[in-house]
């Protein structure tokens, strides 16, 4: 196999697991109202149920690094997608049966392996990006957006066909399991022997040390800012639009446009990175996202919500993926640093919704959007830390 063909296959396999991970997540979110009705949950209880997915992810991330180091990405990918697929099938049956306890357990068991797969995908994505002459990482993340869009539209069609949650989740689970496990066979089967006490202590020290590195902390702040912008949009943009007169359908359509812009930005973002470099691209993304949020915040007065959403989505599209590549510059520390930033992502997924909700309750949701806007302006000022490291 030629090197060019090898990189192409590697890129396709890594992109595939981003797509399937998004497909599962989107399939669950898109049928949220039916899940809520089947389990007889009020809004607060549904919010708690939804938090179990990222909560399971945080648990999974605590041992994702050692798992990959010991067994390699290929075997870990196979095991985690098998668990996630089986749990997703069980989740559908539990929801239709109205069994809240089982639904909670299965949702936790979906979130846990999905976070490990998130780690695997970013490790492989960073590696294939470094092996290529062109910047590929934003395009790999773009397949996550494609998965979100496919999942949402597929769910809409299946609902119109009166497909039960059990049947839908079973079909999605089987498809995701087969495609993802097959894709993982393109990954290198690299494993390390059982660690000695000395090497285990050294690995723990390395993992802990990245949380005290100035560069890693600053990049994590930038990554957190972009994820806060994404999470706050997913949770609050449709609600904010309905507050200013949009129908639920119109708000959903606007949010769909937002995700289309993000996906296109990620698929094409590599060309921008190749032209301007990582640091300038992150600087531009931070400023563009902040300007989009500010335009959206002014929406009730200037009536340009779509302009705000397009700028918001376009700027946000490449920002977070590039912070991961910045964490992966040094192969020796890539695993620990990428684990760090993904942990920040899952922590933000749990905290951002309630935090902005509290501010929104007190001051209005449009005012609350000022928090991610301010953080993105700070991120623009910090963007210099994302310059490529010179590895000695």
Each language-model region and where it sits:
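Intracellular juxtamembrane helix-capping segments at the cytosolic ends
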Residues: 115-130, 317-331
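Extracytoplasmic gate region of multi-pass secondary transporters
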Residues: 28-29, 214-256, 260, 264
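C-terminal ends and interior cores of transmembrane alpha-helices
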Residues: 82-97, 288-300
């Amino acid at each position: 196999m030629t090197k060019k063909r090898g990189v192409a296959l590697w890129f396709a396999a890594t992109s595939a697991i981003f797509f399937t991970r998004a497909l599962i997540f989107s399939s669950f979110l898109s049928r949220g109202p039916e899940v809520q009705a089947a389990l007889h949950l009020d809004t607060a209880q549904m919010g708690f149920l939804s938090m179990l997915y990222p909560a399971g992810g945080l648990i999974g991330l605590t041992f994702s690094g050692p798992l990959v180091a010991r067994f390699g990405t290929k075997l870990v990918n196979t095991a985690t997608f098998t668990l996630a697929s089986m749990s997703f099938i069980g989740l559908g049956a539990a929801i239709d049966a109205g069994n809240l306890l089982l639904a909670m357990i299965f949702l936790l068991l979906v979130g846990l392996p999905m976070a490990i797969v998130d780690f695997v995908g970013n490790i492989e994505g960073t590696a294939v990006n470094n092996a290529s002459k062109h910047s590929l990482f934003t395009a790999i993340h773009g397949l996550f957006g494609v998965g979100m869009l496919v999942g949402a539209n597929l769910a809409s069609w299946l609902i119109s066909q009166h497909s039960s949650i059990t049947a839908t989740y079973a079909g999605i689970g089987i498809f995701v399991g087969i495609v993802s496990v097959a894709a993982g066979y393109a990954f290198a089967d690299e494993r390390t022997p059982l660690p000695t006490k000395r090497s285990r202590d050294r690995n723990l020290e390395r993992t802990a040390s990245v949380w005290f590195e100035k560069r890693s902390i600053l990049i994590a702040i930038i990554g957190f800012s972009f994820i806060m912008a994404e999470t706050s949009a997913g949770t609050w943009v449709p609600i904010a639009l309905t507050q200013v007169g949009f129908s639920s359908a119109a708000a959903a359509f606007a949010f769909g446009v937002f995700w289309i812009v993000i996906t296109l930005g990620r698929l094409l973002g590599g060309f921008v990175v190749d032209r301007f470099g990582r640091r300038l691209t992150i600087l531009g993304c931070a400023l563009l996202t902040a300007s989009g949020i500010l335009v959206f915040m002014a929406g009730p007065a200037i009536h340009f919500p779509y302009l705000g959403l397009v700028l918001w989505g376009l700027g946000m599209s490449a920002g977070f993926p590039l912070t991961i590549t910045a964490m992966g510059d040094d192969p020796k520390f890539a695993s620990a640093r990428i684990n760090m930033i993904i942990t920040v992502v899952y922590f933000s997924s749990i905290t951002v919704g309630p935090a902005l909700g509290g501010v929104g309750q007190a001051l209005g949701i449009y005012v609350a959007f000022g928090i991610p806007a301010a953080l993105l302006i700070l991120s623009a000022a910090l963007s210099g830390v994302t310059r490529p490291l010179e590895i000695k």
